């Protein structure tokens, strides 16, 4: 039985109880949301040590951190450190997007290193195995694709991106609809190229029922990938993106009938004024499936600062219904991120998520209230306790010290200090 099947039968699972307690909501409310497919629970049946996480309606906006090797840089220990740092700074989930080295070993080591849910893109492994054999990616067979997917599910991944919306029909449209950036999804591109080469339908779409069987066996959440997401602002909201979205919406409904949990991935580059409409359209087209967005980035001309562009877009997306933010690092569009890039990316995404969560959950807002109270009292010890990034708090305080009880920005000119002293003097006089 999957979490969705249990929920439909009125069963509150251990995972639902655990999550409801952490989220501060009633177990039965969570059960109803899971039954409808409005909320998903990450917890592969064989991933025994994972702490389950819920994404979707009625729960907090979550943050994912992507890590993984590339064909140029293969350092397994660094990837494990990235995973640990990401979790330390609040990542709710990790995606291993490795494309270089022993992918099975890397994935399994990352899964053992942390206790948060793990996601992958299995088609990457199918493609990498072709290259390792000296073959072209388009030479992979349908069996190669299915073997990679089943291997990841058996290993215990809790969610997996599958580009089921890259169909033969939409690939044909690509021949007449010109984009500025083109197609930027790796997994989506692998499948589009395969379709063009063999003139056959995407196996993951053609045999979607088989994909559902595999996902159901392990209770893996299918993250329906946006292979045709816009890779730059000029391509946002074009016919290709929207055509894929409506295909994904139909596939969500089929998955729900089969008792399989799904979420839908969203755009990566969107002008700031279009974000509310795009997220709301996603919710309508998918019957309120959980929405997973990469950013979205609100500008393209700040390489090195894309984590900030992504946090701005992520906050707006979450405010308008996005449920799951995939972080963006300062290395986006430039190279493979290092550990520090991962830390900065997670913090930026957590900031965006918290900005929305504090509007919906009293305990989240309480943190900000307590910080305001501590600042109003110049209580630095309390501010440190509440601060999200305590290391940065200490670093700046030590770098620019002051002899006053204020900070080195104002010192004796501190507005809070002056008015407190004057009010106290007035009351005692």
UniProtKB/Swiss-Prot annotation:
Keywords tagged on the record: 4Fe-4S, Iron, Iron-sulfur, Lyase, Metal-binding, S-adenosyl-L-methionine, Thiamine biosynthesis, Zinc
Annotated catalysed reactions: 5-amino-1-(5-phospho-beta-D-ribosyl)imidazole + S-adenosyl-L-methionine = 4-amino-2-methyl-5-(phosphooxymethyl)pyrimidine + CO + 5'-deoxyadenosine + formate + L-methionine + 3 H(+)
CC cofactor: [4Fe-4S] cluster
Pathway entry: Cofactor biosynthesis; thiamine diphosphate biosynthesis
Binding positions for Zn(2+) per the UniProt entry: 269, 333
Binding-site residues for [4Fe-4S] cluster, renumbered to this chain: 407, 410, 414
Superkingdom assignment: Archaea
Enzyme Commission code: 4.1.99.17
Cofactor, how bound (note): Binds 1 [4Fe-4S] cluster per subunit. The cluster is coordinated with 3 cysteines and an exchangeable S-adenosyl-L-methionine.
Gene Ontology process terms (BP): thiamine biosynthetic process; thiamine diphosphate biosynthetic process
Binding-site positions, substrate: 66, 95, 124, 163, 185-187, 226-229, 265, 292
InterPro entries (alphabetical): ThiC, ThiC/Bza_core_dom, ThiC/BzaA/B
GO MF, one example: carbon-carbon lyase activity
Functional description taken from the UniProt entry: Catalyzes the synthesis of the hydroxymethylpyrimidine phosphate (HMP-P) moiety of thiamine from aminoimidazole ribotide (AIR) in a radical S-adenosyl-L-methionine (SAM)-dependent reaction.
Family per similarity comment: Belongs to the ThiC family.
Protein name: Phosphomethylpyrimidine synthase
Record organism: Pyrococcus abyssi (strain GE5 / Orsay)
């Amino acid at each position: 039985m999957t979490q969705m099947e249990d929920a439909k039968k009125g069963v509150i699972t251990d995972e639902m109880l655990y999550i409801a307690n952490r989220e501060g909501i009633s177990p039965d409310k969570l059960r109803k949301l899971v039954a409808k497919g409005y909320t998903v629970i990450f917890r592969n049946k064989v991933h025994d040590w994972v702490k389950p996480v819920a994404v979707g309606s009625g729960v907090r906006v979550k943050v994912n951190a992507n890590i993984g090797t590339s064909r140029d840089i293969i350092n397994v220990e660094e990837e494990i450190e990235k995973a640990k740092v990401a979790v330390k700074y609040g990542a709710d989930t990790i995606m291993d997007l490795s494309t270089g080295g022993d992918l099975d070993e890397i994935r399994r080591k990352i899964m053992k290193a942390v206790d948060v849910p793990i996601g992958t893109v299995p088609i990457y492994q199918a493609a990498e195995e072709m290259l390792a054999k000296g073959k072209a990616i388009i030479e992979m067979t349908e069996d190669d694709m299915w073997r990679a997917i089943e291997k990841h599910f058996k290993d215990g991944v809790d969610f997996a991106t599958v580009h089921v919306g890259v169909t033969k029909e939409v690939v044909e449209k690509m021949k007449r609809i010109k984009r500025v950036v083109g197609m930027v999804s790796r997994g989506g591109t692998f499948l589009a190229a395969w379709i063009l080469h063999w003139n056959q339908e995407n196996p993951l779409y053609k045999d979607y029922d088989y994909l559902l069987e595999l996902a159901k066996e392990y209770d893996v959440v299918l993250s329906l990938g946006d292979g045709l997401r816009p890779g730059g602002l000029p391509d946002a909201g074009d016919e290709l993106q929207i055509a894929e979205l409506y295909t994904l919406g139909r596939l969500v409904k089929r998955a729900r009938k089969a008792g399989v949990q799904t979420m839908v991935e969203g755009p990566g580059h969107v002008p700031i004024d279009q974000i509310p409409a795009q997220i709301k359209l996603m919710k309508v087209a998918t019957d309120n499936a959980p929405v997973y967005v990469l950013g979205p980035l609100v500008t393209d001309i700040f390489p090195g600062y894309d984590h900030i562009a992504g946090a701005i877009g992520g906050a707006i997306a979450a405010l308008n219904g996005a449920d799951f933010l995939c972080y963006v690092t300062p290395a986006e569009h430039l190279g493979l991120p290092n550990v520090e890039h991962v830390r900065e990316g997670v913090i930026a995404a957590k900031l965006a998520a918290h900005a929305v969560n504090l509007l919906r959950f009293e305990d989240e807002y309480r943190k900000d209230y307590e910080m305001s109270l501590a600042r109003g009292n110049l209580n630095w010890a309390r501010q440190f306790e509440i601060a999200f990034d305590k290391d940065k708090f200490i670093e700046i305080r030590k770098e620019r010290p002051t002899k006053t009880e204020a900070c080195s920005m104002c010192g004796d000119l501190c507005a809070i200090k002056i008015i407190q002293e004057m009010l106290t003097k007035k009351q005692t006089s």
